[in-house]
Amino acid sequence: MGTFVQWRAEWNAVPTPSYLVYEELLEKNLRILAEVAEDTGAKVLLAQKCFSMYHYYPLIGRYLAGTTASGIYEARLSQEEMGKENHVFKPAYEEDELHRLAAICDHIIFNSFAQWERFGAQTRAAGVSCGIRINPECSTQEHAIYDPCAPGSRLGVKIADFREDLLDGLDGLHFHTLCEQGADALALTLEAVE
């Protein structure tokens, strides 16, 4: 262990900007998430859009079920660096991209029943679990720019457009409306979904 002067010189040599990760705190939080998953039966997934430091994926993979991806590059990163469950959602898919996603993903969420009708059969044939995103039309956000339930949003199927006749083959419903919010907002959203 060097002196403060030596440490400072080393620190000043670090290129900026740089991100520091306290691995002990990261692992402490991961243990909490693993406990939540065990206690509830929920699968806890890493949202790569928020944290894609793949150097830590082996550590994260010891505690979480897998990742969420918003496209082919994040899905590939998940497959290559963590190798656990790989879930993907995008508002729109291109056919060639969906084919590549189906080869590496475990679960694909469609944004509309039109997407499900267009791509569902080929996705299921690849052995991929499929879901559909719903829009609970219940805003819990303070800022419309971050609110997927804001008026005019095209994220997810609204109740007026919901098709019970097209549920066969879907494994679940997906909603994503909570960003840095607590249980109160989740309770309101769940009530709207029910």
PLM regions and their residue ranges:
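Generic N-terminal amphipathic, Lys/Arg-enriched alpha-helix
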Residues: 1-21
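A short alpha-helix capping/helix-coil boundary motif
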Residues: 10-14, 34-37, 52-56
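Active-site-proximal beta-alpha core segment in soluble small-molecule metabolic enzymes
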Residues: 43-194
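N-terminal glycine-rich anion-binding loops that anchor highly charged ligand groups
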Residues: 2-6, 28-32, 38, 43-51
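Active-site anion-handling motifs in enzyme catalytic cores
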Residues: 25
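Sparse, context-dependent recognition of short Cys/His-centered cofactor- or disulfide-binding micro-motifs
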Residues: 4-6, 11, 29, 86, ...
